[in-house]
C-alpha cells in the first residue's frame, strides 16, 4: 500500500517541532485591526503551539509523513 500524501494546505500552515508539537500561525490578523489596541496587535505576532489534542489530529490526518 502506498504512503499517504501530506495535505498541501496543511504543509503551508503547520510545522512540527523536534519534540513532535505542532506550530501554527496566529489567527485573526487579516482585517479589522483598526478596532484593536496596539498591545493586542503586538501580541498576535509570531506563532502558537497547538494544544495536544489538536496537534494529534493534525499529525495523524494531515501530516502523516512529518
Curated annotation (Swiss-Prot):
Gene Ontology molecular-function annotations: structural constituent of ribosome
SUPFAM superfamilies found in the cross-reference section: L35p-like (SSF143034)
UniProt xrefs under Pfam families: Ribosomal_L35p
Transmembrane segments: none
Cellular component GO terms held in the UniProt record: cytosolic large ribosomal subunit
Example of a GO biological process term: translation
Keyword flag Methyltransferase: no
Keywords linked to the UniProt accession: Ribonucleoprotein, Ribosomal protein
Disulfide bonds: none
UniProt-listed InterPro entries: Ribosomal_bL35 (IPR001706), Ribosomal_bL35-like (IPR021137), Ribosomal_bL35_CS (IPR018265), Ribosomal_bL35_sf (IPR037229)
Family the entry assigns: Belongs to the bacterial ribosomal protein bL35 family.
HAMAP family recorded: Ribosomal_bL35 (MF_00514)
The protein's name in its UniProt record: Large ribosomal subunit protein bL35
Organism for this UniProt entry: Azorhizobium caulinodans (strain ATCC 43989 / DSM 5975 / JCM 20966 / LMG 6465 / NBRC 14845 / NCIMB 13405 / ORS 571)
